[in-house]
Amino acid sequence: MGIKGDKKATSDQARLARLTLEGNSGNEEDIQFMIKTIIETTGCTQAQAEIALLDTDNNLYGAIDHILDAGDKLDSWTEQKGAKKEKKKPEEGSYNNRGFVARGRGGGTGFVDRGGRGRSNGAPRESRDNNRDNRDNKEGAAPRSTRGGFEKPYVGRGGRGGARGGYSRAVAPSSALEPDAFTADLDENQTKVDTTVTEVQPPVEESVTATVPTSSAPAPISFAAVAAAAHRKEALRKHQAQNPQPAAPPRRSLSPQPPLPSVAPVKEEPAAAPVFFEPETSHQPEKEDGFFQNESSVLAEEQTPNVSTHHDENVQSTPEPNQAWTTQLKTDLGIGLSEAPGLGLSPIPSAAPVQIIPDPGVEFVGTTAPTNIHDYSFGFVEAAPSPQLPSTESSAASISNASENIFNSSRIMPKQVEPERTSIPNGDYNLKSTSPPLSYGQSNRGLSYDTSSASYQPTDRMAPNKFNNSGPLPTQQSAQQHQPQQQQQQAPQQPVQQQQQTPPAQSQPTGHPQQHPHMMFTQQLPYAPYMNNYMNMYNPMPGVRDEQYTAALMQYGMGVDLTSLLPTAPLSQAASAQQVQSGQQRETHGLMDFNKFGSQSSRDQQPQQASNVGPPPGFQATNYMQQPNLSSLFMQQYSPAPHQFTPFMNMMPNVGSSAGGRQLYGQDDERKSYDKMSGSKPAAQQNQHSQYQHNGGNLGKYGMNKPYNWSN
């Protein structure tokens, strides 16, 4: 209710107001009579009559006068709506008249052919061409070439993305599909330019001034087009530099148009773009020829129109900042300067210093304009020209070298910084197997072992499993506190275990006991590939809370004794040291003593586990790890190769608890033979039965009646 233009709503309001007014309820018939009278008198609608009566407080004559005075404006709401609708029509017409079709920003109301964001869908070609021709004829300029090159509206003007993406999809097809229309435009263009320029032709400077006003607003140059044209232009520029035109006095271009000798001096253009030999026409037809016939002059078209033609009185101010930025950027990057002698790479009016090029067609603004010397100097310098860019090749080479230095230095910089990054004591985040050893020593300061003493570098794979990874943490201090204890404990154990370990590589000199607390962790690393990630999850550093877990794990880690698996002695010593530290009084050299094992292990192990800290979650060491320890320990000594690839298989419950599981790996018979050798087979068998029954009946004697009770 009460919305503008809603007649029914206003009439309802009028009725409600009329009903609520005092004394009106009894005058309904009078009001209806007055409404009829107003309608008959003025020919208005009933709603208008009611509103007029309401506005005039039920004054019949006042309401009639109000309606007659208002006339057409009586319903101001609907009248405004009509005005809005009528406004849209002239707007559409004005868009079309202005040639908005080729300059639209997206698909607006009147821009049928500007499809979407910068992808000019070339559907209504005819309307586009007609609009362009009409616009160009109105402007009195050469059609198509005035917008910064051939059919610039397609190239740089397409939607929001057209200017950045280089040529839109319609460029090449339009030039290829419409050669007749294009040549017709060329002929018109040539005749127009000839008429405008021929009188002034001998002094080329005037030809420039004659053609300058023909330009319309400058179109931005797409870097893709510039880069594409750079290679093609380079050959032409070198060719032109080798064959210099006699009538080209070098001029430093300070006038708004940069000297473009390949384009501005009309007589030299055939050499640059030899496809069309039309020496008498001014630059624009030739630019089109170059673009249409030989794409080598794309730069010329894109830049000369932007530069030379864009500077009429209205537009001069706008292109200069944009093109100055473009030129400076290109000069820094050395994009187009390979074609230096022929073309000022930047479309800027030669305010940019590097753009000084021998230019026969533009007069020098300063007082001292050298006439016979080909030199390059900064614009607005009225002293003798400073040979900033001595020659084409040298300038191009120097720019390329500079660009190479820039890019190479940017590439080299991260390399120089990387060692510093990896050396941050950030532990595992920067550990790489390829980084220098220095970074290891520094990044692993928190790991209380000396990585430089290790026989190999820690691999990336182990890195995420390390815990002490940043700075000298308390673990390092505690590790250092425990080092003397470890050394004392390992000193007697080393000779025993080195005798026990059969591989010769395991002989670690006893003169270096201080390395073993360090080696204890590094030697453990290679076993992560064996899918036993628990080894690294439990921190073997002494003085840390979970050292007893680690001791139990190191001894019984995978159902086999790790001391028999590890390739070098220090790790086995570390394991034994861990056991002694964690309160297990079991003698490590007794592992190889068969007689001791049968009698001692079952007796010692049960009470120890009862009094010890419990094994890590998922490991019930006492119930299924003893017998596999015995058999696999002996097997490892004689055939270590096969079990290094499947050391974790003995962790499976059926392996530890059933003879069938053992027979899968060929261990049962050998275990029995080992038991016979030790002379303690009855004890071992008794231990086996009691072990399984000790589990509360979860496992039968030899069969898996139930799943293993991991929480027991």
Curated annotation (Swiss-Prot):
InterPro entries: TC-DDR_regulator, UBA-like_sf
Biased composition (Gly residues): 156-165
Biased composition (Basic and acidic residues): 79-92, 125-141
Region (Disordered): 79-172, 198-217, 228-265, 410-517, 594-624, 659-712
Predominant place of localization: cytoplasm
Phenotype seen when the gene is deleted: Fewer progeny and embryonic lethality. Fewer stress granules containing gtbp-1 form in embryos exposed to heat shock. Weak, abnormally early expression of adult-specific cuticle collagen col-19 in hypodermal cells in 17% of late larval stage 4 worms but does not induce early alae formation at L4 molt. Suppress heterochronic phenotypes in a lin-4 mutant background. RNAi-mediated knockdown leads to fewer progeny and 50% lethality. Reduction of gtbp-1 levels in the germline.
Keyword Phosphoprotein included in the entry's annotation: yes
Polar residues bias (residue ranges): 431-458, 597-612, 683-696
Keyword Cytoplasm listed: yes
UniProt keyword annotations, A-Z: Cytoplasm, Phosphoprotein
Localisation per UniProt entry: Cytoplasm, Stress granule
UniProt biased composition (Low complexity): 241-255, 474-510
Annotated GO CC locations: cytoplasm; cytoplasmic stress granule; nucleus
Superkingdom to which the source organism belongs: Eukaryota
Function noted in UniProt: Antagonises the activities of multiple heterochronic microRNAs such as lin-4 and let-7 miRNAs. Modulates gene expression and cell fate specification during development. Plays a role in, but not strictly required for, the formation of stress granules. May be involved in protein translation and reducing the expression of mature microRNAs.
Family: Belongs to the Ubiquitin-associated-like family.
Protein name, per record: Prion-like (glutamine/asparagine-rich) domain bearing protein pqn-59
